[in-house]
């Protein structure tokens, strides 16, 4: 996955809603743990966000961090469960920085749950254009062993956990995981509050899919829902709404231009990225990926695509 980070700017504070999110204490910064409820914690020591739910039957995790941060992740998790025994690990998508410790957890008995497309991408050599190479398949032990296509649910420690498919938003295998009773919604990289949104067009993502996925998330959430992205701070529903509206504005500004033959420089000159409620570190990269994704879904652009 490409590590293109940037800061959200220009969003008026009143849009952030009334939900007060917990601040990271010095202890939280040291341990990499941020308590969201008495049983649910955000773990940041893995390089990307890992959500950990402590149940009597073992931990339920959402994502497993970056490959080079596994030791730090395990150290943090021991504060929640000394034996770091995981019952279930959800993968929100296939990218290595979010699934780096998969093999460790599966070898220790965890079931890895993901969309079937995520398993397929992990099992397949994948072209990495920024690195000019193919990424080899992941080991069998690192791949999900329980996959689904639409949605599902489970219970852990009296907590209802719902999960479902988010079609072609960041990859072709994105899912959400909703801790219903705790009102905490993990969305992977379908939300991107702290770096450039990535449209991994090579594995199926496009901006129309991202808008649709965010609309589904907004229907699940309420004003008190804490939304956990794959990287960056916990979000409110109001903040997710702002990001969704930015994506929809860009879609509206670009879909006709792409159909008519515009490329990145043309769209930048036309100001398609101007006046938005966030900035980009690399707008050219974002528009390049947007362009590729739109053409991959050209049948959805207009009946008269040439």
Feature map (PLM): residue ranges:
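N-terminal secretory signal peptides and thylakoid transit peptides that target proteins
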Residues: 1-15
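C-terminal segment of classical bacterial N-terminal signal peptides
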Residues: 18-24
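Boundary at the C-terminal end of the N-terminal hydrophobic targeting segment
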Residues: 27-28
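Conserved beta-strand hairpin/beta-sheet module of binuclear metal-dependent hydrolase folds
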Residues: 32-77, 177-189
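Divalent metal-coordination and catalytic microenvironments
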Residues: 39, 53, 63, 93, ...
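Metallo-beta-lactamase
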Residues: 58-59, 66-68, 153, 160, ...
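C-terminal regulatory/interaction regions
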Residues: 264-306
């Amino acid at each position: 996955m490409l590590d293109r980070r940037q800061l959200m700017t220009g969003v008026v504070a009143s849009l952030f809603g009334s939900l007060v999110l917990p601040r990271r204490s010095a202890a939280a910064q040291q341990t990499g743990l941020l308590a969201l409820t008495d049983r649910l914690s955000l773990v940041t020591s893995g390089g990307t966000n890992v959500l950990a739910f402590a149940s009597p039957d073992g931990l339920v995790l959402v994502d497993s961090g970056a490959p080079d941060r596994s030791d730090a992740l395990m150290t943090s998790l021991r504060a929640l469960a000394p034996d770091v025994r995981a019952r279930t690990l959800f993968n929100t998508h296939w990218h290595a920085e979010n699934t780096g410790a998969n093999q460790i957890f599966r070898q220790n008995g965890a079931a890895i749950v993901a969309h079937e497309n995520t398993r397929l991408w992990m099992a397949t050599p994948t072209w990495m254009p920024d690195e000019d190479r193919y990424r080899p398949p992941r080991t069998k032990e690192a791949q999900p062993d329980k996959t689904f296509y639409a949605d599902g649910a489970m219970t852990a420690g009296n907590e209802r956990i719902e999960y479902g498919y988010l079609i072609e938003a960041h990859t072709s295998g994105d899912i959400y995981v909703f801790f219903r009773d705790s009102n905490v919604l993990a969305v992977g990289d379908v939300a991107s509050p702290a770096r450039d949104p990535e449209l991994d067009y090579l594995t199926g993502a496009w901006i129309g899919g991202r808008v649709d996925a965010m609309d589904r998330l907004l229907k699940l959430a309420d004003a008190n829902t804490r939304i956990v992205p794959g990287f960056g701070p916990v979000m409110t529903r109001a903040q997710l709404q702002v990001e969704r509206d930015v994506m929809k504005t860009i879609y509206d500004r670009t879909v006709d231009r792409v159909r008519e033959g515009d490329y990145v420089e043309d769209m930048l000159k036309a100001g398609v990225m101007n006046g938005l409620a966030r900035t980009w570190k690399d707008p050219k990269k974002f528009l390049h990926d947007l362009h590729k994704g739109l053409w991959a879904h050209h049948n959805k652009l207009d009946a008269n695509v040439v």
